Amino acid sequence: LILVEGPIKDLKDPLNIISFFEKYNPDELYLKKIIFTYVSGWEIHTNSFQIKLGKTINNVKLESLQDTLNYLYENRKIPSMIDLRNKDGVALNYGK
C-alpha cells in the first residue's frame, strides 16, 4: 500500500511515479509514500531513502532518477536522500 498525500488535483503524476518504480524496481526498493507540497514539490519516500523531484515531473527527471538509482545499485551506495530539484544535476545526501 502506497500513501499519497497533498493537494493533488490530477492523479497523473503519482501514477507516473508508481509506474516508474514498478518498471525499475529492484527487489529491495519499494515505495512507502508520495507527498506533494507547494513548497518542495514531489517527495518520494522509499524503504531506504527519500527522493525530492520538485514541482514538475518529466521524462528527463525520471531518466536522471533511473541513472542515479542504477549508479547507486552498482556501487552499493545507500544515500538518505536523492535531490533532483536542481537543474545542474543530482544531489546525494549520505547523512541521516
Please provide the spans of the model-predicted regions:
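Charged, solvent-exposed interaction patches on well-folded alpha/beta domains
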Residues: 1-96
